[in-house]
């Protein structure tokens, strides 16, 4: 059985997330998803949606066999427990792949690292762009309301 691990914050689910998980699932028999903990998200603004809700949403997605929250102290802990054959990275996850491979080896994890290409479909494919559009549209509505 080939186990795949996908990781991410998954704040404000969108078609790009679904594509990443579907493509990850195609690489093996079981897809395990590790959701970033609220307190560990440092590379971008804190998530809007709390970690337990993000976990519940990801658990309900068709390509996902298992989902769990990551560790607050050791990012490799759940990966050691799962023992995946492949770890997938999204196109916009800014990991140095060579460093990640070395870190995995140092932690006794012998998984292949595969980067999933970006989603090229229509619609919103970025949580940041979704939030930006919400702000633009709501600000315009508020401005229109204030001129009435």
From Swiss-Prot:
Its cofactor is a divalent metal cation. GO terms for molecular function: ATP binding; FMN adenylyltransferase activity. ATP binds at residues 9-10, 14-17, 92, 119. Pathway: Cofactor biosynthesis; FAD biosynthesis; FAD from FMN: step 1/1. It catalyses: FMN + ATP + H(+) = FAD + diphosphate. It is an enzyme of class 2 (transferase). The keyword Protease does not apply. Keywords: ATP-binding, FAD, Flavoprotein, FMN, Nucleotide-binding, Nucleotidyltransferase, Transferase. Its EC number is 2.7.7.2. One of its GO terms (biological process) is FAD biosynthetic process. Catalyzes the transfer of the AMP portion of ATP to flavin mononucleotide (FMN) to produce flavin adenine dinucleotide (FAD) coenzyme. Homodimer. Belongs to the archaeal FAD synthase family. NCBIfam families: cyt_tran_rel (TIGR00125). This is FAD synthase. The lineage of its organism: Archaea, Methanobacteriati, Methanobacteriota, Stenosarchaea group, Methanomicrobia.
């Amino acid at each position: 059985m080939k186990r795949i691990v996908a990781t991410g914050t998954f704040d404000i689910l969108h078609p790009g997330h679904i594509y990443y998980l579907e493509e990850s699932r195609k690489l093996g028999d079981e897809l395990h998803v590790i959701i970033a903990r609220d307190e560990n998200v440092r590379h971008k603004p804190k998530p809007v949606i709390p970690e337990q809700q993000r976990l519940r949403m990801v658990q309900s997605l068709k390509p996902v066999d298992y989902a769990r929250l990551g560790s607050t102290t050791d990012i490799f802990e759940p990966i050691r427990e799962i023992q995946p054959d492949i770890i997938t990275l999204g196109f916009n996850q800014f990991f140095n792949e060579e460093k990640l491979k070395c870190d995995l080896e140092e932690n006794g994890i012998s998984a292949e690292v595969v980067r999933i290409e970006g989603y090229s479909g229509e619609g919103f494919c970025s949580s940041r762009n979704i939030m930006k559009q919400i702000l633009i549209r709501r600000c315009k509505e508020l401005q229109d309301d204030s001129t009435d």
